[in-house]
Amino acid sequence: MAAASGASPQSEYIQHHLVHLNNLGEKQSVIAQFNVINYDSLFWSGLMGLIVIFCLWLAARRATAGVPGRFQGFVEMIVDMVNDQAKGIVQNAKSREFVAPLALTVFLWIILMNALDLLPVDLFPTIWRVTGLGAEHGDPLYYHRILPTADLNVPMGMSLGVLLLMFYYGIKIKHPAGFVKELFTAPFHAHGLAALVLAPFNLLLNLIEYAAKSVSLGMRLFGNMFAGELIFMLIALLGGAWTGFNASSIGLGIGHVLAGSVWAIFHILIVLLQAFIFMMLTLVYIGQAHEGH
C-alpha cells in the first residue's frame, strides 16, 4: 500500500488512523462534505452522552439527605461548581433553570469524549484486525476513529447549538423587534442620519461577532484534541520501530514508554481544561445574549 502510493509506512499509518468510519468507505475528499456521515463519531459521542445521563440519573437516585457517599459527593461537587459559575454569569434565574443543567451536561459530555484519546492508539485497530472486522481494506471497521472531538463535525455542531441558543435568548429577552434593532444600532450608537449611515457597519460587526464566537468555540476544542491525537500517533510510531533486542530498538522503546506516559499525564489536563473552557464560554455567550451592548 505504501509502495503503491509512494508514501512512507509512517505516513500511511497516520493517514489510516485519521480516516473515519463513514458512509463512503474511504477518506472524504474535502473538509466540508455534507453528504458524509461519520458513523464512528455518532456512535462514540452518543455512547458517552448516554454514560453521562446514566451517571447523573444514578447519582440522583442514590441521593440521600444524610452524609453523602463518595460518588454522590463527587457529583454534588461538580454540580455546585457549575451552578456557581452559572449564577455568576447568567443573571436571569428563569434562564438558569435550563442553562445550568445544559452547562453541566456539556462539561461532563466533553470530558468523556476527550478522555477516549487516552486509550492506546492501536487498541481498537488491533481488536478489529484480530476479529477480522478490520484486517484489510474493505472490511467493515478497517477505518475507525474513536475520538469524536477530533472530528470537526462534532465540536462545530456543538458550537452551532450554542449559537442558536444565543439567538433564542437574545430574541426571548429583548423581543424580536429589540433584537433586530440592536443588530443595527450597536456597538456604534447614533441618532438621525448618522444612525442610518452606521447601521450597515453595526450589522456587519454583529454578524462577524456571532460568527467568530461560534467558529472559535468549535475550532478551539477540535484543534487541541486533533493535535493531541496526532501526538499520540507519533509516539506510537516509536514503539512500532522495534526490530529486536538491540541498542536502537531498546532506546526507542524506552522513549516510547516515557514520551507516552508524560504526554498522557499532561493530556489529562488538556482533556479537563478544554471541557471547562467550552462550558464557560457557553455560559458567557448565553449570558451576553441577555445583555444589551
From Swiss-Prot:
GO terms for molecular function: proton-transporting ATP synthase activity, rotational mechanism. The gene is atpB. It is a multi-pass membrane protein. Keywords: ATP synthesis, Cell inner membrane, Cell membrane, CF(0), Hydrogen ion transport, Ion transport, Membrane, Transmembrane, Transmembrane helix, Transport. F-type ATPases have 2 components, CF(1) - the catalytic core - and CF(0) - the membrane proton channel. CF(1) has five subunits: alpha(3), beta(3), gamma(1), delta(1), epsilon(1). CF(0) has three main subunits: a(1), b(2) and c(9-12). The alpha and beta chains form an alternating ring which encloses part of the gamma chain. CF(1) is attached to CF(0) by a central stalk formed by the gamma and epsilon chains, while a peripheral stalk is formed by the delta and b chains. It is found in: Cell inner membrane. This is ATP synthase subunit a. InterPro entries: ATP_syn_F0_a_bact/chloroplast, ATP_synth_F0_asu, ATP_synth_F0_asu_AS, F0_ATP_A_sf. One of its GO terms (cellular component) is plasma membrane. The lineage of its organism: Bacteria, Pseudomonadati, Pseudomonadota, Betaproteobacteria, Burkholderiales. Key component of the proton channel; it plays a direct role in the translocation of protons across the membrane. Its main location: membrane. CDD domains: ATP-synt_Fo_a_6.
